[in-house]
Amino acid sequence: MNKIKVVELFAGVGGFRLGLENTKNGIFDITWANQWEPSRKIQHAFDCYSKRFKNGIHSNKDIAQVSDEEMANTEADMIVGGFPCQDYSVARSLNGELGIQGKKGVLFWQIIRYIQNTFPKYLLLENVDRLLKSPSSQRGRDFAVMLSTLNELGYNVEWRVINAADYGNAQRRRRVFIFGYKQDLNYSKAMEESPLDKIIYHNGLFAEAFPIEDYANKNRVNRTHITHDIVDISDNFSFQFYNSGIMKNGEILTIDTIPKYEKSVTLGEIIESNVDDGFSLNQDQIDKFKYLRGPKKIKRTTKDGHEYYFSEGGMSETDSLELPARTMLTSESSINRSTHFLNVDGVYRTLTPIEAERLNGFPDNWTEGMPIKMRYFCMGNALVVPLITRIGNQIEKIDSITNDEFSQLRLF
């Protein structure tokens, strides 16, 4: 099998790369990777990435400062990356000559620039699931801008919101994965002959990698057609995107699908047996955690003197060891309501950095060498590695489709 040359953007500590390098056939070759953390003198994530991976070019600068020429000179059959959910609104330039301008600093437009310079066969992107609903004032606009842009560049797109715990992992981490593929590929031609709902339920990439029930949750199904006028979309588009969907030549079908659940790993199964006393909590810290996790009704006053009550429901006193962990955030190193709070054999403590790595499917001590606070921060930013391996296995199958096989193709 031929190698798939991969460019990894916003690489973090290498979750995409690690997942792709663990695939069945191992045909992914990361040729160029970029990681840059703004306003940080020490680039801990980049240093970790460079320590763990020796092959390929590692770029440690603002992606906006990477020239078109440098992008064009990289080998890219596929672009991957997890990028932040930002404001994707667009406007036409005053003279009209520059076409559509995304808001300055929005990293999605840097992905588009990379695509325009390389036109890879595949795209694999990851984002928080609220991308499908943002902004709250114009639901679905941001994702529609993305889809319209990719459609204009000649890509079809499949997407799925995946909760890692639904497919056998130890963390309830919900993210949207977006798979784009050029419309002239054999896979696209095969999908051209398939009804949109069949792609979502049965023979699309995500249907194969993460099986779902063959009916919609509460009959939630939505269709639309998207245009190339992203200024009009930015100004006027509003639409309900569900957790699964496909865009094929501008036609969109989205369905609220139900996973075929796999037995998840529990928090208790990944915790370390011998933990340093430094992760144990004193009584003041224990009391603070219990207060933060408890129900509240607090009287507050606005700047103009208006009084109101802030209410917050209670959580379980500690995180259950019999369930998958909750979603890790970048603030996992601090005492707050979202941080995991454990009672292990009568000892109250937090997660260790190794446990945080295990929840994302990284090898133990992957982030060793950076400050503990940064180890948690990097894991709060990371994705669940085994999900990428499952997706990568399907991309390997897709890439192996030959012209001779196409006429009689029945996918996988």
From Swiss-Prot:
PROSITE patterns in UniProt: C5_MTASE_1, C5_MTASE_2, SAM_MT_C5
Keywords on record: DNA-binding, Methyltransferase, Restriction system, S-adenosyl-L-methionine, Transferase
CDD domains: Cyt_C5_DNA_methylase
Active-site feature positions: C85
Pfam families: DNA_methylase (PF00145)
Enzyme class: transferase
GO molecular function: DNA (cytosine-5-)-methyltransferase activity; DNA binding
The reaction(s) this protein catalyses: a 2'-deoxycytidine in DNA + S-adenosyl-L-methionine = a 5-methyl-2'-deoxycytidine in DNA + S-adenosyl-L-homocysteine + H(+)
Annotated GO biological process: DNA restriction-modification system; methylation
Domain SAM-dependent MTase C5-type: 4-402
EC number: 2.1.1.37
Family label: Belongs to the class I-like SAM-binding methyltransferase superfamily. C5-methyltransferase family.
Name of the protein in its database record: Type II methyltransferase M.Sau3AI
Name of the gene this protein is made from: sau3AIM
